A protein has these predicted regions:
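Helical mechanochemical/support elements of P-loop NTPase systems and associated helical scaffolds
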Residues: 12, 37, 41, 61, ...
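Conserved P-loop NTPase mechanochemical-coupling segment
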Residues: 150-221, 249-251
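A short, basic N-terminal segment
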Residues: 1-61, 398-426
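The catalytic "switch" region of P-loop NTPases
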Residues: 4-15, 195-358
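P-loop NTPase motor core
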Residues: 82-169
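C-terminal alpha-helical "lid" subdomain
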Residues: 179-194, 312-316, 324-426
Length: 426
């Protein structure tokens, strides 16, 4: 996973440490520098799905990503996002929540996707172009603006207004938005930007564009399909849509389970029928989702149940189980710690004694693997290791005993006696 953004300078390293050291959460930028253990899943997605979508843009696929809280779901989605950007795909990563954006409400989901659609950043440290209107603005300014007016008008009339899209209103709104951008019709641009985002727009303001409907809950799922179809029609390789059930209360009503199941079933069926062209759809959930929610909706259960999760031997399986890592628990923590040590060195221009810090890392990884049987111990390990490295840099290097490692994980840096009991000064 290397591209033009694959550089680790002090600023990026500091961002990574701040994110992971404060909350044990994956960094928004630079995820590749701390990624360990899921490379086999990423290789499958790259070869079996993204590369194939590049050559067969009418295809599409659905994957259910399963992992415990703190088990790397969001981290994995960040890795998939960066991989997709390398291939030129647009991405949208949406955090779902029962209050703000439940997946069973297609209108809120559409608005979230339209707001999160993003193109790859131009370089390290730069933000991606985010939001459907801005992605279309870039397209208009880079592709349409250089054309002669007659050629541009011909493309809008004969191409942008004609390729297959579920909603004719959506196709027209996107094409007219492009026209407004290149012709500097600011009033029309503002109106159509609001429409594309799913905002309420008076019908009287849409009439001059030949649009007679707005995006509402009843047609929001059609609008989401149309968004995908329009962007692929404009020449983008495809989209990777990722939904992260970050705060799902699994004790939801039967009515909401029915709505959630129906929406997911529709997506799976549309992917199977290639009606979401060039789309890889990932939905990340805790394991309880398959045990408690899916069985309540038999049609969804039949589509998601698989005798084996996705692997090199079964690349078409619908389930990506993040507990099926390529490394054991202790080796995984050591791998993460080694990556974080390299990031720490880059952030502070620090050259520690390799043997000492490798020994300290092994002690902390052993203690963490013993300390908790829950997957969430990874976050605690990450935060403790970053804090420990700060101590080593500021107070001088020392060896960490197994007893002191367990104390760090359970108590933190609370007693100066740890220096005497568990650290050996160098």
């Amino acid at each position: 996973m290397k591209d033009k953004t694959d550089t680790l300078d002090a600023a990026l390293a500091g961002h990574i440490l701040a994110r992971m050291g404060e909350a044990g959460q994956p960094p928004e930028h630079g995820i590749r520098h701390v990624n360990v253990g899921n490379e086999h899943f990423l290789d499958i997605l790259r070869v079996e799905y993204l590369d194939r979508l590049l050559t067969q843009s009418r295809g599409s696929a659905f994957k259910l990503v399963q992992g415990y809280y703190g088990g790397g779901k969001t981290h994995f989605l960040y890795c998939v996002r960066d991989l997709a950007w390398e291939k030129g795909f647009l991405t949208a990563l949406v955090s779902l929540s029962p209050q703000e954006c439940p997946y069973e409400d297609p209108y809120l989901v559409y608005r979230a996707v339209a707001g999160q659609v993003a193109a790859a950043p131009e370089g390290a440290g730069l933000e991606p172009t985010r939001g459907l209107p801005d992605v279309l603005r870039d397209l208009a300014e880079e592709t349409l603006a250089p054309l002669a007016p007659a050629e541009r008008d011909r493309w809008l009339r004969r191409s942008a207004m004609r390729f297959p899209v579920d909603s004719h209103s959506y196709r027209r709104a996107a094409a007219e938005f492009l026209r407004c951008v290149v012709e500097e019709d600011r009033e029309g641009e503002v109106v159509l930007e609001a429409w594309l985002r799913g905002d309420a727009v008076p019908r009287s303001e849409l009439r001059r564009f030949g649009i007679f409907e707005t995006i509402e809950r009843a047609n929001a799922f059609q609008a989401l399909r149309s968004l995908c179809q329009v962007l692929v029609g404009y020449g983008f390789p495809g989209l990777v849509l990722m939904f992260d059930e970050a705060d799902r209360n699994l004790s939801i009503s039967s009515r909401r389970i029915q709505a959630l199941g129906d929406n997911l079933r529709q997506v799976i069926d549309l992917c199977g029928a290639s009606q979401l062209p060039g789309v890889l759809f990932l939905y990340a959930v805790p394991p309880e989702f398959l045990r408690l929610v899916v069985p309540e909706y038999p049609a969804l259960d039949q589509r998601l149940r698989s005798p084996v999760p996705m692997s090199r031997h079964s690349p078409q399986a619908a389930l990506i189980d993040l507990e099926q890592m390529a490394l054991g628990a202790e080796s995984l923590l050591e791998g993460i710690g080694t990556r974080l040590l390299a990031v720490f060195k880059a952030a502070y221009d620090w050259e520690p004694t390799v043997a000492i810090q490798q020994g300290n890392l092994q002690a902390l990884a052993r203690a963490s693997a013993r300390f908790s049987l829950e997957i969430g111990h990874r976050r605690q390990f990450v935060k403790t290791w970053v804090a420990f490295l700060h101590q080593q840099r500021l107070r001088g290097e020392s060896w960490l005993s197994d007893e002191a490692a367990e104390a760090l994980l359970s108590q933190g840096f609370v007693s100066s006696s740890l220096d005497e009991q568990g650290f050996s000064d160098v």
